[in-house]
């Protein structure tokens, strides 16, 4: 299958200045970018007068696990029976027929990273996937992209009558399973191919092996400054990879975050603060952190903010002082890097997935319409 987009103004998320060119996609991949391209048998799209952006990317949310008009029956992103559930997998709960996914695609969002919420100290794995499809296995780029953990008010609130009444307890529970997972890994590695020497199988600890081996990061929900730095401290203690999600108080600890040198996903920022740890949320935060040298993505945390409004979150960050090109990258290339899938998505480059959002105006404008979205070279209808 061939797709030829002709005459559009290309915003590729690599070069700061846009340029006019044609894009040829073959079998879902970008095959060529240049002037006066031709391809026999290709579907030709006249993009004259349109801006061509890479498909937008969400670094952190819960779309597909909780969507429109679903209530309890369709809310599957928090498991309230145990605060430590690393064995849970987002791919086992995502509903590809959730209407909010299709709506997100029509809004130019082509890739999302979705997973468990923040009720649990350790919630399970996130999945990175395309926003169209019928079977999550076929939609996935990474079926297990990160291991969710959470700090702050949410674990305390959800388990205050059972097992957690303080931030100290939250941290202790996380450290406990990391200690046990490290020992489990040691025994598995020592056993090698000798099955008789393997430790007794433990589903929770087995699920932690990719974290302990550095294959996936801990994806830490943290709003308040002390919670953010606790996540950094624990990740450093155990030598595991880390990404920070929300980072509401990030502007208060800029130097510390620069030193930590971990990817940050900032948001959601629309709406008034609904709890104490959100009191410092501001559209200035993404720009402050970005200017300091932090790796910043902007997120909706869907369904907190509708997924289709991701580009408007970037627009508000620009209004708060963020460089426009950096804000554009914060919803394309940077979240792809945050997730670990920038070899596939996040920019318009030869060899990457043919995911595009064609718009009749500037990405950040409320007056701009998404005229067409393409995922793997196919139109989203």
Where do the model's predicted regions map?
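Histidine-rich, glycine-flanked metal-binding segment
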Residues: 1-3, 10-55
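C-terminal cap of metal-dependent C-N hydrolases
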Residues: 6-12, 337, 349-381
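Divalent metal-coordination and catalytic microenvironments
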Residues: 8, 23, 28, 49, ...
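His/Asp/Glu-enriched, well-ordered alpha-helical/loop segment
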Residues: 68-69, 75-80, 85, 217, ...
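Active-site gating loops and adjacent loop-to-helix segments of metal-dependent hydrolytic enzymes
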Residues: 69-94, 132-135, 149-158, 197-198, ...
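Active-site core of metal-dependent hydrolases
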Residues: 90, 185-282, 297, 337-339, ...
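Polyanionic/metal-chelating signatures
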Residues: 100, 105-242
